[in-house]
């Protein structure tokens, strides 16, 4: 997939880049797999902001993605490759032999006309096939990985993402995640073979603030530009430093302080992220 540039008829477009849509084959989405999801805008049920710098972004419909891959033993033909406004990778429309249609995340090297399947075991190691992790050979590159059997894929779902199966230990398998973290996952969980497609997304330059607004991201104001009542870094005459250790708006030290709470799943993490 090629990166395209734009003529610099404005200053913001000079450094703006995008992805070509040559790989997209569908002219329209399947209506039965589209659903409206109201935007939360970062507010809770009381209307208060609980997650800052969020907005609705461009108007879009949600595509129902099959993250569970539990349709065992029925082959599916890739009917189309589509754009999904809700994620940074492409999605593939599968047409199953029994007539049902489903969307999945498109892995690299999965093209229109390919036939894939999902099963507990016994499938070829090729992009798009899904099996229980305990039945996948050690060393295989996988994505769309479940953390709990039957819950649906939660790991390695974004563009260019993948994990590697490093070994087995009793009822668990050992995975190296995209962050570099090594952790155990139950062997009964499902995973899909291959690397998530559209890996060139990481090289895109948005170029202007407006493209961030389309994605639902609002501007972020520096604490030092606020008043003392609004932020611990606020106030002072002229351009003044924080005068203390940099903190969040609520006084929590930032720039490196670990804030992750202890969880029951800590015992499954063998080593934390790279350089963390």
UniProtKB/Swiss-Prot annotation:
UniProt region (Disordered), positions on chain: 219-276
GO CC terms: large ribosomal subunit
Transmembrane parts of this sequence: none
Pfam families given in the database record: Ribosomal_L2, Ribosomal_L2_C
Single GO term (MF): structural constituent of ribosome
Keyword Chloroplast appears in the UniProt entry: no
Superkingdom field: Bacteria
Subunit structure as annotated in this protein's UniProt entry: Part of the 50S ribosomal subunit. Forms a bridge to the 30S subunit in the 70S ribosome.
Stated role: One of the primary rRNA binding proteins. Required for association of the 30S and 50S subunits to form the 70S ribosome, for tRNA binding and peptide bond formation. It has been suggested to have peptidyltransferase activity; this is somewhat controversial. Makes several contacts with the 16S rRNA in the 70S ribosome.
NCBIfam families, alphabetized: rplB_bact (TIGR01171)
Protein family (similarity comment): Belongs to the universal ribosomal protein uL2 family.
Name under which the protein is recorded: Large ribosomal subunit protein uL2
Taxonomic source organism: Campylobacter hominis (strain ATCC BAA-381 / DSM 21671 / CCUG 45161 / LMG 19568 / NCTC 13146 / CH001A)
Source species taxonomy: Bacteria, Pseudomonadati, Campylobacterota, Epsilonproteobacteria, Campylobacterales
